[in-house]
């Protein structure tokens, strides 16, 4: 158990979390419930994916306001994982063009976990019947350009890009977890589960919210921790030594925050 501060002078405290390296999941993780095997850099195959369950194949009965919250969370996270995939694709291309094998290898590891995230978020989006963002082509082009451009500037600039992006994403996942907490509590205290044949009273039936909601929160925590590991890698890789680090980080961070706001609705 650790408390991870986001790197930088004005960034908030990340919630307590248990960390395991995103590219070395040898045990089932929350996202494993969606039948997408976790990544493993160790010898041998990963654990077989479990069958789909109520938590991964159905959605809760929510008010319009509650569904809007879930829709905004899922839409922006799916778009964010798409953007991350294209940033790392661009970074790999730019680093390879410079002959920087070390950075290529590090980027490949982070990109692998982002592909896993995107595969899971696509299933979450389908489960909760959330319309994906309409701006996919734009995000793809902009994200690839950002990744490739910073990689062509040098290793430190590429790592500064990763640091800035993952800082914003880490904070954003925390914001989403805070927003989900009242929903988990309210659905647990008001909903009578028709799937519980042993519930004779309301008190018997309201022990927990629809299983998809705590699972979603656990998946967000897992992905947040993965993104913070990418942040660690970037800082250790010399992100803060990049020329114009403060300006570069500020511009990229502002762009990420603007993209989040747009994707929540569009």
Q: Where are these predicted regions, by residue range?
A:
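Non-heme di-metal
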Residues: 2-266
């Amino acid at each position: 158990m650790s408390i991870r501060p986001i790197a930088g002078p004005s960034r908030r405290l990340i919630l307590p979390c248990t960390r395991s390296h995103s590219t070395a999941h040898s045990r089932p993780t929350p996202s494993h419930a969606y039948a997408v095997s976790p990544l493993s850099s160790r010898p041998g195959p990963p654990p077989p994916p479990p069958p789909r369950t109520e938590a991964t194949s159905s959605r809760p009965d929510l008010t319009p306001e509650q569904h809007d919250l879930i829709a905004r969370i899922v839409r922006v996270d799916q778009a964010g994982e798409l953007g991350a995939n294209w940033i790392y694709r661009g970074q790999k291309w730019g680093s390879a063009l410079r002959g920087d094998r070390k950075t290529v290898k590090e980027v490949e590891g982070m990109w692998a976990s982002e592909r896993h995230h995107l595969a899971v978020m696509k299933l979450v989006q389908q489960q909760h019947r959330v319309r994906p963002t309409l701006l996919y082509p734009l995000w793809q082009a902009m994200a690839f350009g950002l990744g490739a451009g910073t990689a062509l500037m040098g290793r430190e600039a590429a790592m500064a890009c990763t640091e800035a992006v993952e800082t914003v994403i880490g904070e954003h996942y925390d914001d989403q977890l805070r927003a989900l907490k009242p929903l988990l509590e309210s659905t647990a205290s008001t909903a009578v589960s028709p799937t519980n044949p042993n519930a004779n009273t309301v008190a018997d039936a309201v022990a927990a919210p629809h299983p998809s909601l705590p699972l979603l929160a656990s998946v967000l925590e897992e992905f947040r921790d993965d993104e913070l590991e990418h942040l660690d890698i970037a800082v250790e890789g010399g992100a803060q030594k990049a020329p114009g680090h403060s300006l570069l980080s500020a511009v990229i961070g502002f762009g990420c925050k603007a993209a989040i706001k747009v994707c929540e609705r569009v």
